[in-house]
């Protein structure tokens, strides 16, 4: 090879006027007579230079530029705009997005029925979308979706029975506004109010309160529009097995078109927020679970701070002191100061004087702080400590209607993984819920995970829906729900990718170290399908241990044999073999 390369250089050199000079130089370099070290080095590097010149000349003559190359203007690359008939649909945190040409919005039950019948006949996809808020994009399908946003009417309110019948496209916030006029409300609420009713029951959403079940338990009856069997009515009396299976059906058994919900009288709650420690929580946990209608803990990693939030109906005998020790500005001022200091460290001094900082809420400030360096553990710890101090200064009481009190500002866009696991009974909690948290916090510190706050822990009673993560045949069983997060406080694609990779590392470590030991299973709206085949096989085996997968797939094949309602995520979580399909 060396001889060939040398011969090529000699041929190229022979075409130039100085070829004889170069030839003598090469001969000198290839001479076998011993030379002093310094002269040898000099001639070695001269040879490298000659080799480089030869390669450059070869490249120039082999790949010549066009004659007008110097006169052409650079044209920046532009993405082609989306066609007018292509809809972009993403979830709340913009972590999952699809583009589709088929996004139907029927405005009545007959139109929905006809759309599904046509899709069934033509073997086309038509995945029920809901509000599309699920963190894992469970409802998204580029092949086609149906959204019931135009089917949002309240059909009937029975004040005596305290029930309401609605079209499934109505949003929770709109339903609550209507129920208010009748002195009614929903029994419990998830953190946000923008979900459609059909979606919130299909994924097994929940609020908090060890005596209160997930929201699917509030469903008394429903109308399910299926591709193969049309519109069917389900209730505890009419086909109870399918009714319970379809209440938390993940949109795979049919499109929920109408729902009758059990309501409760509209009521006020007093919320008590205070800061505790892990030891204090352990001492009082059993009592707090049984005494409080609604309760949750917000754990702050790398601190000994636990924010306890208790909500109960007002008492005739005891009126709490509603005035807080600190005003809102006082409670948040140290967070503003930290942000300004961090701006000086990470950016410029001028930006730290931005008057807009004083108008930001705590969650907005937290997002901006994290955006500066979201994966630096020490930076995240400083933010977590500032959050602990914020909650300490925000201790106190507030009173309002239940739908107002039970909401929660989750912060900005984020990755989230929430698991559900048994925690004993209300009469006899097994304390594994606190063991889980203790192990989780130790894992975070051991692995140096830049885990932001909070780790939210809630409780519910059990559900009779077999596909619910809180499913149980024992009525007094309780379940704990624990959510870990990483915020996506930036629009920078590279930074979001890095946060995403770190989050899945965080989630993987919790899965490996905790899930099996506590029989923990992810919320259906937050479960992510592994890309690795072995990991997917392991996940499918875990799901079979907990859920009636065969019964669910059998119902799918009866109601939707052409898989009109399925998407890639559902197909991977609940694969149906050809033999099962034929049966």
UniProtKB/Swiss-Prot annotation:
It is found in: Mitochondrion membrane. Residues 37-78 form a propeptide. One of its GO terms (molecular function) is galactonolactone dehydrogenase activity. It comes from the Eukaryota. It comes from Oryza sativa subsp. japonica. Pathway: Cofactor biosynthesis; L-ascorbate biosynthesis. Its cofactor is FAD. Residues 95-266 form the FAD-binding PCMH-type domain. GO terms for biological process: L-ascorbic acid biosynthetic process. This is L-galactono-1,4-lactone dehydrogenase 2, mitochondrial. Residues 1-36 form a transit peptide. It holds the Pfam family ALO.
């Amino acid at each position: 090879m060396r001889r060939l390369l040398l011969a090529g250089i000699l041929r190229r050199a022979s075409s130039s006027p100085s070829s004889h000079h170069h030839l003598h130089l090469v001969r000198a370099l290839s001479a076998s007579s011993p030379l002093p070290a310094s002269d040898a080095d000099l001639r070695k590097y001269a040879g490298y230079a000659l080799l480089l010149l030869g390669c450059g000349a070869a490249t120039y003559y082999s790949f010549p530029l066009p004659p007008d190359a110097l006169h052409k203007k650079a044209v920046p690359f532009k993405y082609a705009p989306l066609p007018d008939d292509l809809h972009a649909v993403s979830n709340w945190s913009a972590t999952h997005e699809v583009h589709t040409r088929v996004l139907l919005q029927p405005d009545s039950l007959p139109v929905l029925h006809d759309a599904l019948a046509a899709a069934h006949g033509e073997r086309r996809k038509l995945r029920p979308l809901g509000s599309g808020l699920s963190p894992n994009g469970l409802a998204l399908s580029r092949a086609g979706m149906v959204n019931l946003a135009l089917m949002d009417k309240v059909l009937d309110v029975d004040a005596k029975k305290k029930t309401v019948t609605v079209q499934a496209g109505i949003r929770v916030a709109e339903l609550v506004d209507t129920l208010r006029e009748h002195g009614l409300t929903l029994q419990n609420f998830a953190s946000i109010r923008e979900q459609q009713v059909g979606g919130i029951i299909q994924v097994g959403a929940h609020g908090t309160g060890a005596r209160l079940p997930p929201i699917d338990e509030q469903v008394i009856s429903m109308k399910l529009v299926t591709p193969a069997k049309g519109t069917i009515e389900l209730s505890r009396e009419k086909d109870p097995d399918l009714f319970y299976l379809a209440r938390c059906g993940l949109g795979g058994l049919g499109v929920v078109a109408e729902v009758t919900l059990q309501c409760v009288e509209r009521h006020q709650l007093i919320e008590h927020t205070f800061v505790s420690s892990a030891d204090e929580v352990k001492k009082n946990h059993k009592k707090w679970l049984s005494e409080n209608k609604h309760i949750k803990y917000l754990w702050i990693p790398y601190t000994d701070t636990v924010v306890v939030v208790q909500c109960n109906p007002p008492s005739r005998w005891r009126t709490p002191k509603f005035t807080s020790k600190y005003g809102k500005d006082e409670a948040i001022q140290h967070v503003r100061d930290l942000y300004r200091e961090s701006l000086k460290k990470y950016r410029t001094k001028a930006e730290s004087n931005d008057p807009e900082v004083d108008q930001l809420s705590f969650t907005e400030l937290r997002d901006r702080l994290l955006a500066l360096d979201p994966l630096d553990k020490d930076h995240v710890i400083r933010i977590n400590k500032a959050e602990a101090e914020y909650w300490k200064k925000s201790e106190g009481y507030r009173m309002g209607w239940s739908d107002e009190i039970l909401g929660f500002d989750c912060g900005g866009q984020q990755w989230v993984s929430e698991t559900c696991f048994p925690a004993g009974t209300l009469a006899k909690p097994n304390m594994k819920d606190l063991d889980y948290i203790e192990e989780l916090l130790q894992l975070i510190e051991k692995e140096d995970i830049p885990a932001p706050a909070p780790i939210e822990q809630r409780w519910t009673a059990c559900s009779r829906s077999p596909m619910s993560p809180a499913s149980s045949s024992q009525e007094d069983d309780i379940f704990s729900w624990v959510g870990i997060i990483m915020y996506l406080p930036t629009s920078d694609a590279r930074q979001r990718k890095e946060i995403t990779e770190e989050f899945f590392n965080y989630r993987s470590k919790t899965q490996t170290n905790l899930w099996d030991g506590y029989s923990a299973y992810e919320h259906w709206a937050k479960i992510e399908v592994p890309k690795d085949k072995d990991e997917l096989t392991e996940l499918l085996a875990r799901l079979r241990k907990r859920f009636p997968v065969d019964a669910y797939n059998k119902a799918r094949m009866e109601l939707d044999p052409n898989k009109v309602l399925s998407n890639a995520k559902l197909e991977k979580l609940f694969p149906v073999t050809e033999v099962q399909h034929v049966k």
